[in-house]
Each structure stands twice: as C-alpha cells, then as structure tokens.
C-alpha cells in the first residue's frame, strides 16, 4: 500500500489543513516511509509469541491508604491574604 499526493490532499481537506505542493510531496514521502516500516514489521515471525498489553506483569500497584496528620487550619491560614473563619477567601471569578 502506498500513499499518493491525492490521498494527502484528501486527508488534509478532511482535517481542514492546507499544505503547499512541496509540503504535500514531503508528507507523501514521509507517510510512505512509515508504511514501508510497518510492512517490514509485518514480516517478523511472531509465531509462539504471546501477545502483550503491557511489558509489566504488575497491575494497579497501589500503596495502602494510611491516615496521616494534615496541616492544622491555623497553620494553613497563616499566610492567607484573606480569610473568613477557617476558610480561604478568594475573589469571585464566575459572574
């Protein structure tokens, strides 16, 4: 399979991209190089090779949920430019 300049122009039109003739030629040659590489990969003998979805055997390695002390409200609010009771006050950003 190979890509033609006409194919590149069509795909560019679908993507609402505009290329010069030189860019179309370059894109055509680059896409053809990629397709040639993929065809080479297709020639590799993979009989007996188990398909992988990941190179790691581990799945969802998570740490245990351990309760930790957090910063006290008073300490967190020490440098707050504006506060109300135990909350930060921020400027209104939504009308």
Swiss-Prot record:
Keyword set for this entry? Answer: ATP-binding, Ligase, Nucleotide-binding, Protein biosynthesis
Which Pfam families does the record match to this protein? GatC (PF02686)
GO BP terms: namely: glutaminyl-tRNAGln biosynthesis via transamidation; regulation of translational fidelity; translation
Q: Give its E.C. classification number.
A: 6.3.5.-
This entry's Gene Ontology molecular function terms read:
asparaginyl-tRNA synthase (glutamine-hydrolyzing) activity; ATP binding; glutaminyl-tRNA synthase (glutamine-hydrolyzing) activity
Q: Which reaction does it catalyse?
A: L-glutamyl-tRNA(Gln) + L-glutamine + ATP + H2O = L-glutaminyl-tRNA(Gln) + L-glutamate + ADP + phosphate + H(+); L-aspartyl-tRNA(Asn) + L-glutamine + ATP + H2O = L-asparaginyl-tRNA(Asn) + L-glutamate + ADP + phosphate + 2 H(+)
- Give a short account of what the protein does: Allows the formation of correctly charged Asn-tRNA(Asn) or Gln-tRNA(Gln) through the transamidation of misacylated Asp-tRNA(Asn) or Glu-tRNA(Gln) in organisms which lack either or both of asparaginyl-tRNA or glutaminyl-tRNA synthetases. The reaction takes place in the presence of glutamine and ATP through an activated phospho-Asp-tRNA(Asn) or phospho-Glu-tRNA(Gln).
State the oligomer form and interacting partners: Heterotrimer of A, B and C subunits.
So what family is this one in? Belongs to the GatC family.
| NCBIfam families found in the cross-reference section | gatC (TIGR00135)
State the name under which the record lists this protein: Aspartyl/glutamyl-tRNA(Asn/Gln) amidotransferase subunit C
Gene of this entry:
gatC
